[in-house]
Amino acid sequence: MSRRTRLIAALDTASRSTAQDWADSLKNDVDAIKLGLEFTYACGLDAVKTVSAGHELFLDLKLHDIPHTVASGLTALAPLRPALTTIHASGGSEMIARSREALESAFPADTKRPKLLAVTVLTSMNAEGLLDIGVNATPQEQVLRLGKLAISAGADGLVCSAHEIAPLRDALGDEPVLVVPGIRPAGSASDDQKRIMTPGQAAQAGADWIVVGRPITKAADPVLAARAIMEELASA
């Protein structure tokens, strides 16, 4: 299956003006922007709406609570009209199913519903980190377990590292949307990410979207950094 891997710029900041500057400067050079916990908690939902205007929005709040609370939270977030939004797969099948129902209720059939993405294993986690929280499995084993559960419960796709793309495609096929953080261009610092790949490697593996933050936003010229990644994706 031929797919174009698209680029999400992660605007991870607590500053509304900084996020707005990044969003404005990157408008023609990325496919979407990500606003997550740091920005949303610091600046509020009105700021999310303003900064994301003119962009496809990946609203990455990773909701994880009892099913009713998560479903209600997604209903409250619906006016932001994100293209993609996240919950934790470890919340279980009922939470995922109720989340899907909430989005379908908030977005009638003739409107574009946000894609519901289930976060599997954070890209900062490795086998040792999983064992610390009582999971005696490799990251790949846990991603596959949670990925199968999430898709069967109604998630549209998954957030996973690039290392799990191939086994997920083998297990679940081409339909689930795979969004891949932990992307670092060659020569970039890995920071707190442990399971990383380059943009080109992730595209070749079959990612639908890649998420890149600090290699863009902390670059001397964020626009040039984003363009270089887009060129790498196009040639992958």
Curated annotation (Swiss-Prot):
Protein name in the entry: Orotidine 5'-phosphate decarboxylase
PANTHER family: OROTIDINE 5'-PHOSPHATE DECARBOXYLASE
Subunit and partners: Homodimer.
Residues where substrate binds: 12, 34, 60-69, 123, 184, 193, 213-214
Organism listed in the record: Gluconobacter oxydans (strain 621H)
Lineage, broadest ranks: Bacteria, Pseudomonadati, Pseudomonadota, Alphaproteobacteria, Acetobacterales
Function recorded in the entry: Catalyzes the decarboxylation of orotidine 5'-monophosphate (OMP) to uridine 5'-monophosphate (UMP).
Protein keywords: Decarboxylase, Lyase, Pyrimidine biosynthesis
A GO CC term attached to the entry: cytosol
